[in-house]
Amino acid sequence: FPPFSVGEAGRFGFTSRREIGHGALAERSVLPVLPPEDDFPYAIRLVSEVMSSNGSTSMASVCGGSLALMDAGVPLSQHVAGISTGLVTEMDDDGNIAKYVILTDIIGAEDHFGDMDFKLCGTRDGVTGFQLDLKIRGLPFNIAKEAVKQVTEARMKILDVMDACQPAHRKELREHAPRIEMVQIDPEKIGALIGPGGKNIRRITEVTGANIDIDDDNSGKVRVYAKDRDA
């Protein structure tokens, strides 16, 4: 989230509190749809670079991140989308809310002058992450309920567009993506795979460029790590 994305002049080279907070919310929202490690034993680094911002870049990062993961071949259970709602209120003489308007997909000015920034992420089945920032003393239940209903309807529309663009994850990883494969062999054949003094396993590594890791529990599970599909 560089300063120029919001028209500011600032320093580069360190992570800001805004980037940490937005990143944590986006990560928490995407985690529930990631596959278990046994099915997809890869380390995943998801980067969202903001070039221009006028509100809710964390929600854009969730939507863009979900599309990017699907396009990369990560088998997400389903898409995740996020959107924010705002609130503008008018108080009576006693300090109670007399009038209010709930705003969907707020921009920077509506966030600055408004009374609420309610970010909510989820799939078609439920919520995966949310964050509520308020400038008023409290949020009445009826307004909170209306805001959730409004943001849920908006999320479904976003998911419709995302599903039309990328309905499912790619069946295979990109050609040049690192590969991890698990092969089950007869435990009695482990010695033959290793060879005298590790001769066989070293030869395989030299020829293919792949690394081979054999589980220590004598289960016969062999993991092959390669830099790309050809290896």
Predicted segments — roles?
Residues 206-217:
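Polar interaction faces of repeat-based domains
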Residues 1, 27, 37-52, 173-176, ...:
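Glycine- and acidic-rich phosphate- and metal-coordinating loops
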Residues 69-171:
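Mobile "lid/hinge" segments at catalytic clefts and subdomain interfaces of large enzymes
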Residues 157-184, 229-231:
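Long, charged amphipathic helices and adjacent flexible linkers at domain junctions
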Residues 54-75, 191-201:
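Conserved phosphate/anionic-ligand binding catalytic regions in large, soluble enzymes, centered on
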Residues 10-15, 48-56:
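A short glycine/serine-rich beta->alpha loop
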Residues 216-227:
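Short glycine/threonine-rich beta-strand-turn micro-motifs
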Residues 1-42, 128-136, 140-145:
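Glycine-rich, flexible beta-strand/loop modules in the N-terminal catalytic cores of phosphate-handling
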